[in-house]
């Protein structure tokens, strides 16, 4: 069941990468978050999945505020979507980890979650990079 949620999360994130409309792309990113929460909550700490959920949803709503008012969208075909889908299915497939030594809050700072931190950071950086590229350099950030 965990692998089904993982496959659905990866598929919805790939669809958000392919989709050009910022509203639909944010919608599919929210779906990918909802499908990845059972996978993350199967680890040691349940509070960590809620923490990721709050941070990710606040970022999605910031993306909606900045990008939904922009009307010039440059259509670019994405040929890397199938490669990214296969790479994420092969490399990031979930395994249920059972640790009993890191049950405290201090386990948050150890090397267990560094992979998850780096993966989420890379996904968000790629999304922001390609979203600003697809918007035809019309200004994804506020001008001073």
Swiss-Prot record:
A GO MF label: NADH dehydrogenase (ubiquinone) activity
Membrane topology: Multi-pass membrane protein
Reaction(s) the record says it catalyses: a ubiquinone + NADH + 5 H(+)(in) = a ubiquinol + NAD(+) + 4 H(+)(out)
Parts of the chain that traverse the membrane: 1-21, 25-45, 46-66, 79-99, 108-128
Top-level taxon: Eukaryota
An individual GO BP term: mitochondrial electron transport, NADH to ubiquinone
CC per GO annotation: mitochondrial membrane
EC number: 7.1.1.2
UniProt entry tagged with the keyword DNA-binding: no
Localization (cell): Mitochondrion membrane
Result for mutant: residue 81 to S: In strain: CB4854
Keyword Ribosomal protein among UniProt keywords: no
Enzyme class: translocase
Impact upon substituting residue 90 to F: In strain: AB1, AB2, CB4852, CB4853, CB4855, CB4857, CB4858, KR314 and PB306
Entry keywords, A to Z: Electron transport, Membrane, Mitochondrion, NAD, Respiratory chain, Translocase, Transmembrane, Transmembrane helix, Transport, Ubiquinone
UniProt similarity note: Belongs to the complex I subunit 6 family.
Function of the molecule: Core subunit of the mitochondrial membrane respiratory chain NADH dehydrogenase (Complex I) that is believed to belong to the minimal assembly required for catalysis. Complex I functions in the transfer of electrons from NADH to the respiratory chain. The immediate electron acceptor for the enzyme is believed to be ubiquinone.
Protein name from the UniProt record: NADH-ubiquinone oxidoreductase chain 6
UniProt gene name: nduo-6
